[in-house]
């Protein structure tokens, strides 16, 4: 099971590739890809289908034995994006006549220092000319070799570096791409790389490239480590590990009375306020359309919402042995201790006593341990998907996730055992 997760992480350096890989696995398992611009048609028990939005979010559905008005929805949601650096337009910056850097901007909230002095690569999507102005073609790109590096300043020029350094997002974190050896290469290095990669798939001319969404990614493969290989080291565990756990559960679960939903949103790391984010009404539209297809009435959707339950799956903070003072004294999850239910008195999480009891019961039924997380009262925490989604669809639900160390680092640390626990709990949820 863990090797499949590692393969998925290695093949999914950015949101676009993660969604494509999820879509491919859904298709291989018999789910039909539907165009959301077309009618759903008649739906019957066992029908399995999915739709995508913006190439970076994906929504999978399996219709249950009972109409949604009678049995509701069981929904697992997660997000496809992770903190990184986005490559700006006109990105090449020439220094001293030959050294080429790329101009980037920060996406989300990365621990920027963790991106230094490690091999990086480029991944994302390229938009090329299509049949007409409103129908450009999307091509995905993943340069599968080390291509760039952000280098530290030597300690001899910065004697205070180990006392903490404030980094400039515009100056200090620009990656080195290469050296130009020919006058014709100046201003063309990045585009030449893009063309080389795209032409592995099909012939693309430079004039056909209209734009791109390209990002930096760690070029070092995900791996396990520890005396018993009990830990996972990888970028993007937050939140691709939860995406993959939800996918594994969806593909292995039995058909049940309840309609099963897997929703992988984008842009959680920047607030979710996009057409492909959790704040979008897109999922609500799809659920309402399922109700209309079954009954011809919106009333089915409103009844289903009252019977539904949502698991918002986004990683939690594991207790760090070097910084115990940062954690709540009685509610600090441990690596390998099982899925973590998140609570916050300021309502940053959807969990309450009633919904937490439901999830804890699911874990118990699946034979999985369960933990609880509350922030240290003097340390501000983050927010996640649950309440954002619940503000547009008033779902009963819980915010949870597997515990990880170094959240938002270029490489995070998780637990092999926790991934196995999470898949069991999610599968139990879908089976009920």
What is the meaning of each model-derived region?
Residues 1-432:
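N-terminal hydrophobic/helix-forming segments and targeting peptides
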């Amino acid at each position: 099971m863990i090797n499949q997760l590692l393969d998925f992480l290695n093949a999914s350096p950015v949101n676009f590739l993660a969604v494509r890989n999820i879509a491919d696995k859904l298709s291989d398992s018999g789910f039909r890809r539907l165009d959301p611009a077309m009618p759903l048609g008649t739906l019957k028990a066992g029908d399995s289908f999915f739709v995508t939005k913006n190439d970076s979010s994906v929504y999978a559905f399996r219709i249950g034995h009972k109409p949604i008005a009678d049995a509701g929805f069981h929904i697992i949601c997660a997000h496809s994006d992770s903190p990184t650096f986005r490559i700006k337009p006109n990105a090449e910056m020439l220094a001293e006549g030959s050294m080429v850097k790329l101009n980037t901007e920060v996406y989300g909230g990365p621990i920027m220092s963790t991106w230094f002095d490690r091999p990086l690569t480029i991944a994302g999507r390229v938009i090329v000319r299509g049949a007409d102005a409103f129908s450009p073609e999307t091509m995905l790109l993943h340069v599968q070799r080390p291509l760039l590096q952000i280098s530290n300043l030597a300690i001899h020029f910065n004697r205070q570096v180990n006392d903490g350094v404030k980094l400039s997002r515009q100056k200090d974190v620009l990656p080195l791409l290469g050296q130009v050896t020919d006058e014709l290469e100046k201003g063309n290095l990045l585009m030449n790389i893009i063309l080389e990669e795209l032409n592995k798939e099909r012939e693309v001319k430079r004039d056909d490239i209209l734009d791109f969404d390209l990002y930096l990614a760690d070029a070092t493969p995900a791996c396990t480590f520890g005396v018993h290989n009990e830990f996972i080291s990888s970028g993007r565990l937050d939140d691709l590990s939860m995406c993959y756990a939800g996918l594994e559960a969806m593909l292995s679960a039995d058909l049940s009375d309840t309609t099963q939903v897997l929703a992988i949103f984008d842009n959680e790391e920047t607030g979710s306020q996009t057409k492909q984010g959790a704040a979008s009404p897109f999922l609500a539209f799809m659920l309402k359309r399922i109700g209309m297809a079954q009954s011809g009435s919106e009333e089915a959707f409103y009844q289903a919402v009252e019977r539904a339950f949502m698991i918002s799956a986004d990683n939690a903070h594991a207790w760090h042995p070097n910084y115990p003072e940062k954690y709540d004294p009685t509610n600090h999850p441990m690596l390998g201790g099982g899925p973590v239910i998140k609570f916050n008195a300021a309502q940053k999480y959807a969990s309450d006593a009633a919904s937490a009891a439901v999830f804890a019961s699911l874990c118990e039924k699946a034979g999985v341990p369960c933990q609880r997380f509350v922030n240290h009262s003097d340390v501000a925490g983050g927010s996640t998907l649950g309440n954002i989604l619940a503000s547009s669809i008033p779902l009963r639900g819980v915010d949870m996730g597997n515990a990880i160390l170094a959240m938002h680092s270029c490489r995070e640390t998780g637990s092999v055992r926790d991934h196995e626990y999470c898949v069991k709990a999610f599968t139990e949820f879908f089976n009920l």
